[in-house]
Amino acid sequence: MNKMTEPKFAVGDRVIYNPKRTGNGWLAGEHGTVIYVDNTEAAYTVEFDVPVAEGNTDYRARANEIEPKPWHGWFCKEENLEAEA
């Protein structure tokens, strides 16, 4: 497995959506849990603790470019962000 497709997170990891990302600003700062890891694309499906949109009962959102370091991608691990504080 090369560096591009090496999983950064595992199922069950707690993550926070990057509040600085503007593409999906409505998710800024939201917490969630990784529920699926696609090892082929290093993509993840995150189930958020709150609905991703008003009236939306599907709390899942898929994102690529996830990095474990705070805000070097769409998400970071909760524990990594807490360690930076």
Predicted regions and their residues:
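Mixed-charge, Lys/Arg-rich low-complexity intrinsically disordered regions
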Residues: 1-23
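Generic beta-strand structural signal
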Residues: 10, 37-39, 83
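Short aromatic-glycine-enriched beta-strand elements
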Residues: 41-45
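Intrinsically disordered, low-complexity, charged/polar segments
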Residues: 49-85
